[in-house]
Every structure is written in structure tokens, then in C-alpha cells.
């Protein structure tokens, strides 16, 4: 399992204790199957918050997808040149449980202050706990990331598995805004699932990022899954043998 730090293990243990306190493992695994179906077959419902509707789906998201996102981002930022450069602030757009933002921030020395933003109140609370567990200084706020006001000064901006949950009308203006921030010295990292049909806007964004001097990558990494993730993986019949994603970095 990587990263193999005590804090990562403690975070996983706290997630398991919290989310299995009032739900059985069977209930969570059943909710994970439903959540996976939402991502694969009913992605149009994501803009309405379908992924986090109900305790079961929220627990499944936190226990399964959160650790996977953390491991993926931790790997990506180690591979991207300048991703680990010192920066005062990390803006975690659509922070979810904070797993992805914590992975990037924890890899930087010294860790930046995190600003976690999400439209879902449960996600904001969950992210605050995640950042705190990793010993990161952070503020969280319930905000629509499509209309976010970026902080003054240099920052790293992360949008991990978040932009595809916006409508096209809400998403498109962000491209120019993120490119402008990068032109003034910010680091911008966008991550989405690898499946080609998931983000139909991806190729257009990729071309724009590459024209601006950025890069696009696809990732397939094999790691030992954390025990709770592996157990849910088997129980829900998802057969995750590797962690995958694609990224844009500017």
C-alpha cells in the first residue's frame, strides 16, 4: 500500500470506524454497487448530486473512492515536474472528502494551506476532517466551484474528479480562468476518469492546455489496495486491478 505512512493508515482506520458505526459492511457494499452504476450508467444525474444521495452512498464514496483518489493523486504529483514546488496555497476545487487535495498538499514541503471548496455540505465537513487528520492547515467552504473567486497570490489549483460533475455551461468558463491563473505562475492540475466517454469535453481542454504549454497524461498504477478498499472491491464485484485516471497539468 502506498503511501505507507502512519497518517494514511490512521485516516483509513478513522474512515472505517466512522462509516461502519451505523451501517453494516453489506449495506455499504450494496451502496457502492449503486454508486458505481451512477458513475458508469447514469452520469447525467451527477449534476444533481446523485453520487452523495443517502448515507450508504456517502459511506461508499468515502471508504472506496476517497482512498483510490488519494493514492492516484499522490502518484501523479510525484511524477509531474514542478508539481511539488513550494507554494503557499492549494485550492481544492470540488474537494469531495478532501482525499485528493490532502494527497497533493502532504507531498509538498512545507505543505501549503488548503482551501477546500464543494457545493455539498457533507463533503465540506468530511474534507475538513480529512485535512485535519493529515495535519494540514485548511479552510473549507460550501461553494459552487464554477463561480469561485481564486485567492490572491500564487497557488496550486486542483480539480480532481470534479469538473465532469458540472454542466457544460458552468464548466467552460473555467478553462480560460484556469489558463490565465497558470500564465501568472499558478500550477493547475485537472484529473478525471480514464474512460473515454466519461468527459466528452476532455479533448477540447487537452488541446487548449497543450497549446498553453501544459501536458496531458494517462495513468495506470498497480498498488496494494488498502484492506477496506480491497474488501469492498471484492464484495461489490468491481474488479479494480489498477488505479487509473488522466490528467492535465499546466
Question: Whereabouts are the PLM-identified features?
Answer:
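A short glycine-rich, Lys/Arg-flanked "PGG" loop and its adjoining helix->strand segment in the class I
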Residues: 172-184
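Class I S-adenosyl-L-methionine
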Residues: 212-250
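Class I SAM-dependent methyltransferase Rossmann-like catalytic core
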Residues: 47-76
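Conserved SAM/SAH-binding beta-strand->alpha-helix loop
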Residues: 120
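Conserved SAM-binding loop of SAM-dependent methyltransferases across substrates and taxa
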Residues: 97-110
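A short SAM/SAH-binding and catalytic strip from SAM-dependent methyltransferases
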Residues: 155-169
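Conserved beta-strand signature within the Rossmann-like core of class I S-adenosyl-L-methionine
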Residues: 184-193
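N-terminal auxiliary segments of SAM/dcSAM-dependent transferases
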Residues: 1-48
Amino acid at each position: 500500500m502506498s503511501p505507507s505512512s502512519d497518517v494514511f493508515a490512521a485516516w483509513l482506520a478513522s474512515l472505517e470506524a466512522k462509516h461502519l458505526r451505523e451501517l453494516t459492511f453489506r449495506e455499504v457494499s450494496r451502496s457502492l454497487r449503486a454508486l458505481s452504476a451512477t458513475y458508469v450508467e447514469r452520469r447525467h444525474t451527477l449534476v444533481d448530486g446523485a453520487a452523495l444521495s443517502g448515507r450508504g452512498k456517502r459511506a461508499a464514496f468515502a471508504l472506496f473512492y476517497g482512498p483510490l483518489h488519494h493514492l492516484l493523486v499522490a502518484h501523479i504529483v510525484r511524477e509531474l515536474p514542478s508539481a511539488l514546488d513550494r507554494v503557499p496555497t492549494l485550492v481544492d476545487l470540488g474537494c469531495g472528502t478532501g482525499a485528493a487535495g490532502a494527497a497533493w498538499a502532504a507531498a509538498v514541503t512545507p505543505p501549503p494551506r488548503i482551501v477546500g471548496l464543494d457545493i455539498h455540505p457533507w463533503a465540506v465537513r468530511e474534507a475538513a476532517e480529512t485535512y485535519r487528520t493529515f495535519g494540514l492547515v485548511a479552510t473549507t467552504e460550501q461553494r459552487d466551484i464554477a463561480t469561485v473567486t481564486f485567492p490572491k497570490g500564487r497557488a496550486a489549483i486542483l480539480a480532481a474528479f470534479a469538473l465532469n460533475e458540472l454542466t457544460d455551461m458552468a464548466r467552460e468558463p473555467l478553462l480560460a480562468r484556469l489558463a490565465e491563473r497558470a500564465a501568472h505562475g499558478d500550477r493547475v492540475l485537472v484529473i478525471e476518469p480514464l474512460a473515454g466517454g466519461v468527459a466528452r469535453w476532455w479533448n477540447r481542454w487537452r488541446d487548449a492546455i497543450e497549446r498553453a504549454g501544459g501536458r496531458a497524461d494517462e495513468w495506470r498504477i498497480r498498488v496494494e489496495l488498502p484492506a477496506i478498499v480491497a474488501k469492498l472491491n471484492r464484495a461489490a464485484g468491481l474488479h479494480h486491478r489498477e488505479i487509473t485516471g488522466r490528467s492535465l497539468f499546466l
